A protein has these predicted regions:
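An anion/pyrophosphate-binding glycine-rich loop and adjacent beta-alpha core
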Residues: 1-87
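Gly/Ser/Thr-rich beta-alpha loop segments that engage phosphate groups in nucleotides
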Residues: 6-9, 123-124, 147, 154-158
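Predominant activation on well-ordered alpha-helical scaffold segments within soluble catalytic domains
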Residues: 10-11, 94-97, 101, 163-171
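N-terminal low-complexity, intrinsically disordered patches enriched in charged
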Residues: 13-16, 130-131, 165
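Short, surface-exposed, polar/charged, turn-prone segments marking secondary-structure boundaries
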Residues: 27-29, 56-60, 127, 135-136, ...
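A glycine-rich dinucleotide-binding beta-alpha-beta segment and adjacent secondary-structure elements
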Residues: 71-151
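A conserved FAD-binding loop/helix module that cradles the flavin
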Residues: 149-174
Length: 174
C-alpha cells in the first residue's frame, strides 16, 4: 500500500502484532516468490537474465516483480542499477535471490483507528452474560458486535460475532 503492508494474511497477523508493535518495532519477512524454492528461483533469474543480458539491471526485473517493487529491490540488492545484466556476478545474483526469498520490512506502527478494518478493545466479555449479552454490572444494558473486546482473524468471523451477539441480545430484550 502507500503506507505499508496489507492483505488477508497481514490482517490476521495484525491482531497479534498490534499488541507488540505498541512496545517495539517488528521485523516482517516476506517470501516474494513462495512458489519457488531458492534453487528454482535462481534458475528463473538466470533464464530472465539470459533474455535481458544487454539490459541494465534496473530494467531487467519486469517479468519477475511488480513495477512499483522493482526500484526497492534494486536498491536493497546493492547491485548498481545501470549495471548490464551480463556483468552481474554469481554472488550478486545469489544476493538478489536471497533478497527475494527473505524480503525484510521493519514495522514501526499502525495507521490508526480511522483506517482500521478490525479494532481491539471494548467492553470486557468477562463483564457480559454470554447467553443474553446483558451487562453483569448494569442491569438492562446489552452489548453486541465490535463494542465488545473481541476480534477474530479474517474470513467473516468478526461479522459472525456481530450477528450472533446482536441476536442473543435482541432475543433477551423485554
Amino acid at each position: 500500500t502507500h503506507f505499508g503492508v496489507s492483505g488477508p494474511t497481514v490482517l490476521s497477523a495484525s491482531s497479534y502484532a498490534a499488541k507488540v508493535i505498541r512496545q517495539k518495532n517488528l521485523l516482517l519477512t516476506i517470501d516474494l516468490k513462495p512458489a519457488l524454492d531458492e534453487a528454482q528461483l535462481d534458475e528463473r533469474v538466470l533464464r530472465d537474465f539470459e533474455e535481458a543480458k544487454n539490459k541494465s539491471f534496473k530494467n531487467s526485473l519486469d517479468k519477475l516483480l511488480p513495477k512499483k517493487l522493482i526500484p526497492v529491490v534494486v536498491e536493497l540488492s546493492k547491485i548498481p542499477p545501470d549495471k548490464k545484466i551480463h556483468e552481474v556476478t554469481k554472488q550478486e545474483r545469489q544476493r538478489l535471490v536471497t533478497l527475494l526469498k527473505n524480503f525484510k520490512l521493519t514495522l514501526t506502527g499502525l495507521r490508526g483507528f480511522q483506517e482500521a478494518i478490525i479494532t481491539q478493545g471494548g467492553v470486557s466479555v468477562k463483564e457480559v452474560n454470554p447467553a443474553t449479552m446483558e451487562s453483569k454490572l448494569v442491569s438492562g444494558v446489552y452489548f453486541a458486535g465490535e463494542v465488545l473486546d473481541v476480534d477474530a482473524v479474517t474470513g467473516g468471523f468478526n461479522l459472525q460475532i456481530a450477528w450472533s451477539t446482536a441476536y442473543a441480545a435482541a432475543a433477551h430484550l423485554s
